């Protein structure tokens, strides 16, 4: 009976944890709309970290970069390489967009593991990585969709819509459906991976609070970085595809 009682209490504790992470939110009323306040708070923190780091690193630019300037120039070169590989020679105007997506998602993902969000108490819910909320990932995916539609229409005009009947008009429904599945796959892939990683860490910490969670947290940091790279790479690939006019 003691074992059964202990198991029930453990399951109840895990249920309470998952309820806090998934089902409860801290809402704000803004202009008649109800928004997730904790997502705005953590998103502003991530944006402040990015802007503050960039400002400090490049406030005194040097011809031969060192320290923070060298790091940010390396990151910029990396983003340029990703953009050029996926988009082609006309990648230049899209580097800021791809870079913003990559850096925001990367820092958001890592903030879930590295920043002590849990010590900040809210009336409802808890603070967590912005990408832990489906609203954030859907918004990023929709921005990507708008970007590749804009890229295609800017480059090819109304001829862009001709892709829906290529290589045969029979594929029209499938080609239209593809444009709806792209943002769905982008948003749910990112959301699912980040949410699952945070829940696994919370569960392990509650059960075995000392050594076991550390390797999982390190693996989570690695996969979080990979997810940011995947999202940015796919966004660039979709933009390049819309500009080229073929799949």
Swiss-Prot record:
GO terms for molecular function: proton-transporting ATP synthase activity, rotational mechanism. Keywords: ATP synthesis, CF(0), Chloroplast, Hydrogen ion transport, Ion transport, Membrane, Plastid, Thylakoid, Transmembrane, Transmembrane helix, Transport. This is ATP synthase subunit a, chloroplastic. Key component of the proton channel; it plays a direct role in the translocation of protons across the membrane. Belongs to the ATPase A chain family. The keyword Cell cycle does not apply. It is a multi-pass membrane protein. Coiled coil: none annotated. The gene is atpI. Pfam families: ATP-synt_A. HAMAP family: ATP_synth_a_bact (MF_01393). It is found in: Plastid, Chloroplast thylakoid membrane. It comes from Solanum lycopersicum. The chain crosses the membrane at residues 38-58, 95-115, 134-154, 199-219, 220-240. Its main location: plastid. NCBIfam families: ATP_synt_6_or_A. F-type ATPases have 2 components, CF(1) - the catalytic core - and CF(0) - the membrane proton channel. CF(1) has five subunits: alpha(3), beta(3), gamma(1), delta(1), epsilon(1). CF(0) has four main subunits: a, b, b' and c. One of its GO terms (cellular component) is chloroplast thylakoid membrane.
